[in-house]
């Protein structure tokens, strides 16, 4: 069973998140469909989305960046040299392509190492589950708010639909 996209977005908004940007992924379609009508800002690259989110935070917004896990690799330098160093929080919503599922070959490596990459750079994360998504969102919102650090919600195929 899946979390409805509207419920997931509603949970993010309940925690005050109000600026959404990123690069699309089919695993995130239900979320993106919901956000399109609410001012979602598409970015050409994930590191660009991180920059947009940092600017939004400095302007008083609470940003979320949506991306595929391959985009985590693209955005690591921005996260490490901007967000982590200067404690500029961002909530990352990352699809888990190639993670414990059969997927296209280009997703195999990132699927295997996504959680280790996050652990290596000390970005807390939760893998979103249907029965745990409320707690998952709350836990990562707390990291964002209290520690002023990036935090990630990882979305498996079909977890949000």
Regions found by a protein language model. Give the residues of each.
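Thiamine diphosphate
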Residues: 1-161
